[in-house]
């Protein structure tokens, strides 16, 4: 169970960083 918790925390951390980069620097497709 500990491995599952650690993988969950790792995925959530990477997801937060990924979305923060996207929302900070949005793609310029519309522009």
UniProtKB/Swiss-Prot annotation:
Keywords: Cyanelle, Membrane, Photosynthesis, Photosystem II, Plastid, Thylakoid, Transmembrane, Transmembrane helix
InterPro entries: PSII_PsbT, PSII_PsbT_sf
GO biological process: photosynthesis
Record localization: Plastid, Cyanelle thylakoid membrane
Spans traversing the lipid bilayer: 3-23
Topology relative to the membrane: Single-pass membrane protein
Any one GO cellular component localisation term in the record: photosystem II reaction center
Superkingdom of the organism of origin: Eukaryota
Family: Belongs to the PsbT family.
Function of the molecule: Found at the monomer-monomer interface of the photosystem II (PS II) dimer, plays a role in assembly and dimerization of PSII. PSII is a light-driven water plastoquinone oxidoreductase, using light energy to abstract electrons from H(2)O, generating a proton gradient subsequently used for ATP formation.
Subunit structure: PSII is composed of 1 copy each of membrane proteins PsbA, PsbB, PsbC, PsbD, PsbE, PsbF, PsbH, PsbI, PsbJ, PsbK, PsbL, PsbM, PsbT, PsbX, PsbY, PsbZ, Psb30/Ycf12, at least 3 peripheral proteins of the oxygen-evolving complex and a large number of cofactors. It forms dimeric complexes.
The name this protein goes by in its record: Photosystem II reaction center protein T
Species, as recorded: Cyanophora paradoxa
